Amino acid sequence: MVVLATGVRANLDLVTQLGLDVGQLGGAVVAPTMQAYRRGRLVPDVFLAGDLVQSESAVMPGPTMSQLGSSAVKEGRVAGINAAGGKALSGPVASPWVSVIGDLQIAGTGLSQGLASWYGIETVSGKAAGSTRARYYPGGTPLTVKISADRVSRRIVGAQIIAGEDATGRINWLTAAVVEGVTADDFLVRAENAYCPPASMVQDVAIKAAEDLCRRLNQ
């Protein structure tokens, strides 16, 4: 098997034909209403969404390219409401994702340590491993959670998960922390998880990863 990861590039043919503004990341520039710009001014009745637009980042100042189906649906809803005469705004994105490869679910949100370094953000990461169910309960699968935070502000900037099941719910939980600007300390104080042996451990692995992160931040 050969896996070729080539990335995604926005098709800007229509944007170029209309003379709309394109940003530094190669995506169309839009307002929070998803309305397009031309020479720095909003263009009446032209709304864009999806792979070809730059979105506001929830992690750092400035735009990002969130070329994901979930982002496109969120932006498309806002564009449609405003195009029909309603009022709606699109907020910042953390770009959560999940993939299934064989028996593994791999998920992430926000910035990886490598991408954070590229943006000039020094991060510290905490990691923990456990099971998706109580250790004594049959059917659970191994689960590893990694959480990264800005060393200075201690704000959570990203997370990654590898599991046999239930990665989506956990990454959505951590995405909320990224979007809200929660620090590692606040997450550890405020986070709670539902518990039932067939469905979870009594203390979720994400909380254990946050404990490890706080220890490393304090070193």
Each predicted region: which residue ranges?
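FAD-site-proximal beta/loop scaffold in flavoenzymes
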Residues: M1-V78, W173, A177
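Flexible, glycine-rich terminal cap/loop adjacent to redox cofactors
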Residues: L4-T6, L104-T109, Y119-Q219
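A short alpha-helix-loop-beta-strand transition element characteristic
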Residues: D21-L25, G86-W97, E122-G126
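Short secondary-structure boundary/capping segments
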Residues: R38-R39, V98, Y137
